[in-house]
From Swiss-Prot:
It is a peripheral membrane protein. Gene3D superfamilies: 3.40.50.360. It is found in: Cell inner membrane. Regulatory subunit of a potassium efflux system that confers protection against electrophiles. Required for full activity of KefB. This is Glutathione-regulated potassium-efflux system ancillary protein KefG. Pfam families: Flavodoxin_2 (PF02525). Keywords: Cell inner membrane, Cell membrane, Membrane, NAD, Oxidoreductase. Interacts with KefB.
């Protein structure tokens, strides 16, 4: 039996202590030997990112998961800084930038609004696929495989049972992320 893919879970939440949904989602990740949970806000409270260290982590893993809340139609500031610094030209793109070719990218997003708010005729004016397009384009720039995102809409309004169900499905996917496909 082959080993499961090595997963680097980049967790970026500036107020992690207040996010019940994200804490519940992280529980199964911590239990898998093939998953490295890397809390960016815990490691870099001053935003000074150790780029060589982060790039080494990326090289060691097959699947990169970006777990974060949706902040102003994007990611929290530290993750944006991480993307700009770590996925640099010559490492992830451009001449010689082939370090992430063939790896997998998956976004795991929590939102503060219901799924119905993400439509052309609704509050946010665009579907989530459009909102997340910059991440998909970044994955393409790095020549990574874009996996369909996991989105927990209106996360703070879910019952503990519903959050546990999301966490269970997420944990099952993390156990074998490449062959398991979507969740």
């Amino acid at each position: 039996m082959s080993q499961p893919a090595k997963v680097l879970l980049l967790y970026a939440h500036p107020e992690s202590q207040d996010s019940v949904a994200n804490r519940v989602l992280l529980k199964p990740a911590i239990q898998h030997n093939n998953v490295t949970v890397h809390d960016l806000y815990a490691r870099y409270p001053d935003f000074f990112i150790d780029t060589p260290y982060e790039q080494a982590l990326l090289r060691e893993h097959d699947v990169i998961v970006f777990q974060h809340p949706l902040y102003t139609y994007s990611c929290p500031a530290l993750l944006k800084e991480w993307l700009d610094r770590v996925l640099s030209r010559g490492f992830a793109s451009g001449p010689g930038g082939n370090q992430l070719v063939g790896k997998y990218w998956r976004s795991v997003i929590t939102t503060g609004e219901p799924e119905s708010a993400y439509r052309y005729d609704a509050l946010n004016r665009y579907p989530m696929s459009d909102v997340l397009r910059p991440f998909e384009l970044t994955a393409a720039m790095c020549r990574m495989h874009w996996m369909p995102p996991i989105i927990v809409y209106w996360a703070r309004r879910h019952s503990p049972q519903t959050l546990a169900s999301h966490a269970k499905a997420y944990g099952e996917w993390l156990a074998n992320p490449v062959s398991a496909g979507g969740y």
